[in-house]
Structure formats: structure tokens, C-alpha cells
């Protein structure tokens, strides 16, 4: 809750679940949030963060597929969310899901780095898993959308910026044994239902809360 007792409005955010084929099955890339982080400190999460204004203005190398865009709804917001997922992952892990292109007139270190590579976010590589909304009693709230992509489409070397610690590839079983929150556990289950990391289809789940109890709906 906010200081007035009214629930804080959730901020739009996006996360990217990068997967690859490992020796023991599908692996996902995760990192640990810093101990002093304001939101879920010390928890292992997927790379991601809130949508920034430039995510709406950046020019992608390729658009979302029609199927993925339709599952997300509003076209402009869908693109901004997807760009944010790619940008945040690039910032936090050094891996860029990109293709040849020019990000446009947006400024900042991440965009400059993409521009130097002659690359921009390749949104066509993303599929959409689902979304989650933080409980109303939390002082920090997000409306997070979770995307999925194959790591083989990313370029770069795994090297964090320091925002996420202990970046590592783990199997789904190993990930469930890490300190994770319920939303992360749910998204891992969704990934586990996909044969060989196939693209999610059908109605996307919404993970939210009624009071402090998790509720999953398929609106």
C-alpha cells in the first residue's frame, strides 16, 4: 500500500526467459538480485525491469510476430514491453537478442552499445509466456510480462552489469531449488510444459493475488 492506504499503481515491466538445450535438458538463465535491492532482495530472477520511455521510441530490427502481438493485445504497448525485455537483458547479462538494424534516435549507454554493434532488438525472436501483478499490499508493484526466447539467437558474452549477481544457466529442476518467489516458480512451470522449449500458444495466464493468496486466471 501507499502512504495513503491506497494500493500503489503497478508499473509496466518485462522479463526475458532465455533458454537453451543443456546436457540435462532445458536450461534457463537466472541471476540473484542484490541483497539491498528494494524489490525482492536476494531472490533469483530472470533478467528484466520496468518499461522506460525510450522503449516506446526505439526502432527494433524486426517486429513481434503476429501471433505474439495478438496474445499481448495493444500493439504499441506490446512493442514497448518486448523492447524493454531485450534491453534489460542486454544491460544485466551482456547478451543481446538482436538483428542488423538502427535503434533510432534514442540515447543512453545501452542504445549506444547496440548502435555500435549495428544491431537493434529482434522482437520476432520473442514469444509471450504470461503476466503477473504484484500484490496490492506491496509498496512496490509491477505488472510484469514474461517473454521466452532461445539463447542461440542472442549475441555477446555473459557478463553482468552488477545489477544481477551469480548469473548462471540452470535446469528447470535446479532453478526450483534456488531462492525464488512464487511468480518465478509459476513461470518456470509454464516453460516446463512446453515440449523442447516450443512457443507458448493459446490464452496467456495472469498470475495475481486475492489478498495474499496467488490466483491464476486465463483471461
Pin down the residues of each PLM region.
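N-terminal leader/linker segments that precede catalytic domains of diphosphate-processing enzymes
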Residues: 1-219
Amino acid at each position: 500500500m501507499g502512504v495513503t492506504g491506497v494500493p500503489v499503481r503497478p508499473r509496466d515491466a518485462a522479463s526475458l526467459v532465455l533458454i537453451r538445450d543443456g546436457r540435462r535438458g532445458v536450461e534457463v538463465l537466472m541471476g540473484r538480485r542484490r541483497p539491498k535491492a528494494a524489490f525482492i532482495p536476494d531472490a533469483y530472477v530472470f533478467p528484466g525491469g520496468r518499461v522506460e520511455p525510450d522503449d516506446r521510441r526505439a526502432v527494433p530490427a524486426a517486429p513481434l510476430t503476429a501471433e505474439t502481438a495478438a496474445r499481448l493485445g495493444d500493439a504499441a504497448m506490446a512493442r514497448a514491453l518486448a523492447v524493454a525485455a531485450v534491453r534489460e537483458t542486454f544491460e544485466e547479462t551482456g547478451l543481446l537478442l538482436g538483428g542488423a538494424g538502427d535503434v533510432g534516435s534514442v540515447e543512453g549507454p545501452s542504445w549506444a552499445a547496440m548502435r555500435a554493434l549495428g544491431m537493434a532488438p529482434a522482437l520476432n525472436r520473442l514469444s509471450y509466456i504470461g503476466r503477473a501483478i504484484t500484490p496490492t499490499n506491496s509498496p512496490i508493484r509491477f505488472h510484469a510480462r514474461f517473454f521466452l526466447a532461445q539463447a542461440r539467437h542472442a549475441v555477446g558474452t555473459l557478463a553482468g552489469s552488477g545489477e544481477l549477481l551469480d548469473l548462471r544457466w540452470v535446469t528447470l529442476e535446479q532453478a526450483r531449488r534456488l531462492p525464488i518467489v512464487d511468480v518465478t516458480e509459476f513461470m518456470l512451470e509454464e516453460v516446463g510444459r512446453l515440449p523442447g522449449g516450443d512457443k507458448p500458444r493459446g490464452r496467456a495466464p495472469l498470475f495475481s493475488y486475492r489478498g495474499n493468496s496467488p490466483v491464476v486466471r486465463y483471461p
